[in-house]
Regions:
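Signal peptide-directed extracytoplasmic domains
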Residues: 75-136, 147-153
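N-terminal segment of the mature soluble domain
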Residues: 57-76, 127-180, 263, 268-287, ...
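Amphipathic beta-strand/beta-sheet edge segments enriched in Tyr/Trp
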Residues: 40-42, 46, 183-227, 287, ...
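C-terminal soluble interaction/assembly domains
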Residues: 236-331
């Protein structure tokens, strides 16, 4: 029998403390990413019967595997399907709502091991926030953009899909014209993402933009969100996340003890970082060995989301026998 708990413990005390400090440190600047709870899911519950609850636990586990890996077919992997058939060893907490929905939290360590057994990658919880620019049919003809103050059925469908895939989304506070929306979608940088959907005779035409790249597709609202999730997962959940590696990273811009403490707290709070070891400290530059689920390129991409660690200028040469840093800390 699974205990009905009230709290989810997904990380060690030190890491939870670090992530809390990271949140406080970054509150002073707007975040371009959302911190997604990877191993949680909300699913319908047919009844309070044990068989229905077990089936709901299994469905929630499949959804958690999709959220954590970024792969829409993760639930079909043999190891995931076997775990979903007997999920009790993975469930850490659950609760039910008045709407007969089951909220389930899974053990993070057990789920991460399960993803590895299934040969699935890991999509870190720091994910770009996607601004949705959705143009729905207007009563007077043509289309109009959905704003944050509105909740048409299409928005609800997108948000349900975003919950399943683990994609943080936001909506424009004010109306946007079609030309501006197209420009934003095709010119989105590394700090944010834009999903543009325009209603047409055969459904919706979708354009997703992030990091200077764009992808296109067609289909309903859920298909548009799926395009965004698949594109982001391809960038942030590479094959290197299937295992652990040690990545040496040289970081400059450390102007004192407080700066160094803030940096180490930041690094330890990142979800793909498993360990932070200082190898060398010289002047304002530190060389760390980071144990990560991924590689240096993924670290670069995650760092770029909030700009706290920026690539060191290529023109910055080594001085006094000290190697040039890879990144510069922005306190």
């Amino acid at each position: 029998m699974i205990a009905h708990c009230t709290n989810v413990v997904t990380e060690g005390t030190a890491r939870k403390f670090a992530r809390g400090l990271l949140f406080l440190l970054l509150m002073v600047s707007p975040l371009a990413w959302g911190d997604v709870a990877l191993y949680q899911a909300v699913v319908p519950l047919k009844s309070t019967a044990e068989a229905d609850r077990a089936a709901a636990f299994g469905e929630a586990l499949r959804i958690a595997a999709v959220r954590a890996s970024g792969r829409r077919d993760a639930g079909d992997a043999a190891a995931i399907a076997a775990a979903a058939a007997d999920p009790t060893g993975y469930v850490q907490q659950y609760s039910t709502t008045a709407e007969r929905m089951l909220k389930v939290g899974f053990d993070a360590r057990a789920m991460e091991q399960l993803l590895q057994q299934a040969g699935l990658p890991l999509w870190p919880s720091e994910r770009p926030t996607t601004t949705v620019l959705l143009f729905v049919p207007a009563i007077a003809g043509g289309t109009r953009a959905v704003t944050a103050a509105e909740r048409p059925p299409e928005r609800l469908e997108i948000e349900r899909a975003a919950q399943v895939r683990g994609v943080p989304v936001t909506w424009p506070a004010e109306t946007v014209d079609a030309g501006t929306a197209r420009a934003r979608a095709t010119s989105a940088g590394v700090t944010g993402a834009v999903l543009l959907g325009t209603a047409g005779a055969g459904g919706y035409d979708w354009t997703f933009g992030h990091a200077g790249q764009s992808a296109r597709g067609q289909g309903g609202p859920a298909a548009g969100l799926g395009l965004a999730a698949d594109t982001l997962a391809a960038r942030y959940a590479p094959g290197s996340t299937r295992g652990l590696s040690t990545v040496p990273v040289r970081i400059g811009g450390l102007e004192g003890v407080r700066s160094y403490a803030a940096l180490t707290t930041y690094l330890d709070g990142l979800s793909l970082v498993r360990s932070v070891s200082l190898r060398e400290l010289a002047g304002s530059t530190a060389l760390f060995d980071l144990g990560v689920r991924g590689d240096l390129e993924l670290l670069r991409r995650i760092f770029a989301l909030d700009g706290r660690l920026t690539p060191a200028p290529r023109t910055e040469a080594a001085t006094n026998g000290q190697e040039a840093p890879d990144f510069v800390w922005q306190p």
